[in-house]
């Protein structure tokens, strides 16, 4: 005897509300985005803890950061041309714009190649291809930041930064000072001269301290710039061959060591002759 079972009708799933579907889709997308941001921030935090140093540009790079970033086409040819593997191509997590070349002096300084292959390989003008003298490059400026830990400031003869300088006695010299601790010895203080320092980074890389007391900083951080509105009187006098200010034109009170103040009489006004007046 055959028994025929009745088939159960399939239950239809209720249709998902379009608004609810849209909400779940947006929520999933937002959660994924936040997770990605968290990963990136974590990587950047780990990178910052690494304290890899100040990023510097290759020799003869355009000094203006915006101009360099605009001129660099991120081709990496300068990095490939460096025979010492000193240059790096920046990634998304690097301290400079992705795809641009940089180096960390504490890790690997510039070896000052006489033929400047990195600059010669640049096709865009971000690096000066016409440069011929590597000693004229200005990758940064050496600055002795920490006098409290520098061994020479403690009265010890370290002199390593001075000895490794490619332009010894020009870019870095040793200046003597009295040692107040012993009262009978001299301190030999490393002194950087900005007119000769190339910013190669050999001094920073060679510093014997765990954290270098001398560092290479970008020029805009290391050196103040005199505003265009300033005029140095002695320079203007040398250019003109005479003083540009009439004698006794400016009269300021004179304060004597005794504490008295002498106020000079006002000078006669000086009128410049009017051109074409014949006077």
Swiss-Prot record:
[4Fe-4S] cluster 3 binds at residues 150, 158, 161, 165. [4Fe-4S] cluster 2 binds at residues 110, 113, 118, 122. [4Fe-4S] cluster 1 binds at residues 72, 75, 78, 82. SUPFAM superfamilies: 4Fe-4S ferredoxins. Keywords: 4Fe-4S, Electron transport, Iron, Iron-sulfur, Metal-binding, Periplasm, Repeat, Signal, Transport. Residues 1-50 form the signal peptide. GO terms for molecular function: 4 iron, 4 sulfur cluster binding; metal ion binding. Required for electron transfer from ubiquinol, via NapC, to the periplasmic nitrate reductase NapAB complex. This is Ferredoxin-type protein NapG. It comes from Haemophilus influenzae (strain ATCC 51907 / DSM 11121 / KW20 / Rd). The lineage of its organism: Bacteria, Pseudomonadati, Pseudomonadota, Gammaproteobacteria, Pasteurellales.
């Amino acid at each position: 005897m055959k028994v025929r079972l009745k088939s159960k009708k399939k239950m239809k799933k209720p249709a998902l509300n379009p608004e609810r579907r849209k909400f779940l889709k947006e929520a999933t997308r937002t959660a994924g985005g936040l997770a990605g941001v968290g990963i990136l921030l974590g990587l950047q935090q780990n990178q910052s803890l690494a304290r890899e140093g100040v990023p510097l540009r290759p020799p003869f790079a355009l000094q203006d950061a915006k101009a360099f970033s605009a001129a660099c086409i991120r081709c990496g040819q300068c990095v490939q041309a460096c025979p010492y593997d000193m240059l790096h191509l920046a990634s998304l997590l690097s301290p400079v714009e992705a795809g641009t070349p940089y180096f960390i002096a504490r890790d690997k300084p510039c070896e000052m190649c006489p033929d400047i292959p990195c600059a010669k390989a640049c096709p865009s003008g971000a690096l000066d291809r016409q440069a011929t003298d590597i000693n004229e490059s200005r990758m940064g400026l050496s600055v002795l930041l920490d006098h409290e830990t520098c061994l020479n400031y403690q009265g010890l003869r370290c002199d390593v930064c001075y000895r490794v300088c490619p332009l010894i006695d020009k870019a870095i010299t040793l200046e003597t000072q009295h040692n107040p601790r012993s009262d009978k010895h001299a301190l030999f203080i490393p002194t950087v001269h900005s007119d000769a320092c190339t910013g190669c980074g050999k001094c920073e890389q060679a510093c014997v301290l765990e954290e270098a007391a001398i560092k290479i900083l970008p020029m805009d951080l290391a050196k103040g710039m005199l505003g265009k509105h300033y005029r140095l009187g002695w320079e203007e006098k040398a250019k003109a061959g005479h003083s540009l200010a009439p004698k006794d034109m400016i009269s300021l009170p004179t304060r004597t060591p005794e504490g008295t103040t002498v106020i000079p009489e006002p000078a006669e006004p000086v009128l410049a002759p009017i051109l074409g007046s014949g006077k």
